[in-house]
C-alpha cells in the first residue's frame, strides 16, 4: 500500500485508511475506552469551538435562544410518536438500574430531544402570544453505533439541535428553510464545502417528520456526506405531547413544530473535502491556527525568536490566529511536515538571513505559489487577504471536484458507473421498493431532491415507471 514519508496511506489506495490515519496523526481525536466513543483532543475541539461560535451567532441573530434539557428521558416519551420510536429503537441506550435497583421506568439516554422538549413546550405554551417559541440546545447525544468511524459515526457525539413551535404550517415551513439556509451558509462560507441543499425522499426522512431537508457534500472519494438536516414535523409531535395554543379567535389548536441539527460530523466533512496525501487542509475561517511561524535558529538566536514573536503579535492584532513553533528539540523540516499534516493554511519560515533582508518565507498549504519571500513590515496588513484567497481557492477546488464527479444519467448502466465514483443525477419513480433495490445493487441511496434542480419528468432510471418529484434526484454512496 502506497504511503508518503509521513506514513500515511495515499487517498487513491484506500481512502478510509487515509481518513482514519490522518485524524489520529494530526491530533484531532483519540479512541475512548467504551466501544464507539471518541475523545476530541484540544486541536480538534478548537475547530469545533470555532464552528460552534459562528453557528451559535447565526442562530441567535435569527431570534433563537439557547436552553438545556435533560440527558435522561423517560422511555414512555419515545413511545408517544410511533414513527419516531421505530426509527431510533436500534440505536437506543437505556438505563434500567440505579444503585443496584431496577427502575420503575427505564430511562433512555438522549438520542435526540424532540420528546423531552415537546413535553416542556406543552407546559410553556398556552396562547398564540407564546408563539413562535424558538429554542436551541448545544448537547451530546448517544446513538449506539455498531460500525464507528471518528467524527462520522460514533456512539456519542456533540451537536446543536433547534426546536421550534409555530401557529401554522406556513410559519413552521419558513423556519425549516431558515435553518437550512443557515447550514448552507456555514458549510459554504466557513467550511468551504459546496453542499447541495435539497429535500429527502420519503424513505430517507427523519423518523416522524413530514418533510426533511438536507445539505449534502461530496467528499474526495466521491461519497456523499449528510452535513446538516432540518425537519418540518407538522402537528405529529404536538399531537403526541399535547402542544396546544388558543388562537386569536379563541379556538384551541395544535402547534406546528420543527427540529434541525448540525454536529461534529462537520469536522469529518472538512477533513474529507479538503485533505490530501500530506494530511489535513483547513479552510482559514475555521482553522485553529491560520498561520504558523517557524523560527529557524541553531542553538537559539534571540533576534530571530524575538522577531517571530513580534510578527505573531502583529498578526494577532489584525485578527489572524497565529502560532509560533519554537520547540528547540525539533528540526525545521520536522515542523514543516507536522504543520502540513495538521492542515495549517499558511506557514512562515523566518531565519537569520530573512531577518537581515527584512523578509519572511511564506508557504501556503496548497496551490502553485511555492515559497514566496514577502516583506515582514507589510505582511500583517496583507495576511487577511491571503487567507481570504486561500478560502476561496478551497471552495473553488471542492466545487470543481464535485461538478467533475456528478453525472446526469438516463440508463441503468450509466447510473451504476456514475455512483461507483461519485453522484448520479437521475429521474426516479419515488417507490420505496425501487429505492431499496437500487441500494442493494449499488449501495447508492437518494441523497436529496435538489432545491435548485431544473423541472424535468420522464421515466425511472431503474424500473421505468413514471418519474416522481418533477426533477432529477441525486443518488450516491454515503457515509
Swiss-Prot record:
Transmembrane spans: none
The reaction(s) this protein catalyses: tRNA(Pro) + L-proline + ATP = L-prolyl-tRNA(Pro) + AMP + diphosphate
Entry EC number(s): 6.1.1.15
UniProt signal peptide: none
UniProt entry keywords in alphabetical sequence: Aminoacyl-tRNA synthetase, ATP-binding, Cytoplasm, Ligase, Nucleotide-binding, Protein biosynthesis
PROSITE patterns listed in its UniProt record: AA_TRNA_LIGASE_II
Protein's GO biological process: prolyl-tRNA aminoacylation
Compartmental location: Cytoplasm
Keyword Protein biosynthesis (UniProt): yes
A GO CC term attached to the entry: aminoacyl-tRNA synthetase multienzyme complex
GO molecular function: ATP binding; proline-tRNA ligase activity
UniProt remark on domains: Consists of three domains: the N-terminal catalytic domain, the anticodon-binding domain and the C-terminal extension.
Family note: Belongs to the class-II aminoacyl-tRNA synthetase family. ProS type 3 subfamily.
PANTHER family: BIFUNCTIONAL GLUTAMATE_PROLINE--TRNA LIGASE, PROLYL-TRNA SYNTHETASE
Reported function: Catalyzes the attachment of proline to tRNA(Pro) in a two-step reaction: proline is first activated by ATP to form Pro-AMP and then transferred to the acceptor end of tRNA(Pro).
Subunit and interaction comment: Homodimer.
Identification of the protein by name: Proline--tRNA ligase 2
Gene that encodes the chain: proS2
